[in-house]
């Protein structure tokens, strides 16, 4: 099943071509810039379109062959779209705070996930015998785990691909992925370095509408990959995940 594509017009409509002020640029992004206007760098969307298509194809193929995608975006305007896209496509996410060692120290993280699940089970069952204070303490611990680990609770191991919004903010996550040889797909604004990004997608990483467009595209790529995998195995596709309403995806 073919991966989705994102049109030039959809990127323009979302403001994906607007970079940062020219004095805030990272010179390593020069090859991806069209020029500047009124002191703002303009990203070359003629490169973004094929690079996005390449990244979406990677994600679709990865999921089709049983791989896992980790969505990472902890900045305010990315938190909701990241979580929604990952949930809708049956993938995994970190949208609150990247914990050091989240991938490179997976054994410790997996033990924390076990504790998190045990707390959920305990609190959803009979809490008879516990004081109100004890229940409150356990609830607070559970909620803290939910924020940091809720999106990866069912990942079951390190991911096969990482998708990142804002490579500057998620520098630690990218470093861990690089250490483990996990390919990174990242939206790169004019103020970031493309170093360590195997699948760069030059585009604005601040505009809420643009972020939602990218997340929906990646979710759709993962969904189509999963459908393709089921199809290859001869499984029923009747329960396929609902496609996004964004008409920019083809």
From Swiss-Prot:
GO cellular component, one term: cytosolic small ribosomal subunit
Keywords, comma-separated and alphabetical: Ribonucleoprotein, Ribosomal protein
GO molecular function: structural constituent of ribosome
Protein family: Belongs to the universal ribosomal protein uS2 family.
Family annotation (HAMAP family): Ribosomal_uS2_B
Segments of this protein annotated with the region Disordered: 225-250
Annotated GO biological process: translation
Organism whose genome encodes this protein: Rhizorhabdus wittichii (strain DSM 6014 / CCUG 31198 / JCM 15750 / NBRC 105917 / EY 4224 / RW1) (Sphingomonas wittichii)
A Pfam family that the UniProt record links to this protein: Ribosomal_S2
Protein name: Small ribosomal subunit protein uS2
SUPFAM superfamilies assigned: Ribosomal protein S2
């Amino acid at each position: 099943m073919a991966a989705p594509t994102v049109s030039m017009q959809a990127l323009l409509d979302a403001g994906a071509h607007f970079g940062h002020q020219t004095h805030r640029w990272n010179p390593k992004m020069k090859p991806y810039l069209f020029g500047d206007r009124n002191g703002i760098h303009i990203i070359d969307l003629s490169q973004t379109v094929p690079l996005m298509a390449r990244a979406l194809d990677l994600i679709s193929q990865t999921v089709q062959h049983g791989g896992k995608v980790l969505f990472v975006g902890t900045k305010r305007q990315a938190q909701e779209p990241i979580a929604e896209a990952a949930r809708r496509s049956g993938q995994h996410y970190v949208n609150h705070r990247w914990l050091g060692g989240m991938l490179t120290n997976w054994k410790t993280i997996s033990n924390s996930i076990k504790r998190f699940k045990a707390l959920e089970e305990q609190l959803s069952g009979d809490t008879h015998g516990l004081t109100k204070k004890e229940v409150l303490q356990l609830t607070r611990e559970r909620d803290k785990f939910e924020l940091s680990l809720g999106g990866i609770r069912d990942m079951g191991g390190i991911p096969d691909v990482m998708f990142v919004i804002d490579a500057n903010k998620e520098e630690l996550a990218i470093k861990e992925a690089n250490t483990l040889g996990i390919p990174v797909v990242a939206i790169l604004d004019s103020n970031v370095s493309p170093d360590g990004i195997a699948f760069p997608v030059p585009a604005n990483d601040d505009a809420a509408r643009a972020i939602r467009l990218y997340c929906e595209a990646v979710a759709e790529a993962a969904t189509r990959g999963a459908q393709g995998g089921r199809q290859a195995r001869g499984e029923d596709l009747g329960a396929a995940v609902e496609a996004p309403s964004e008409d920019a995806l083809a």
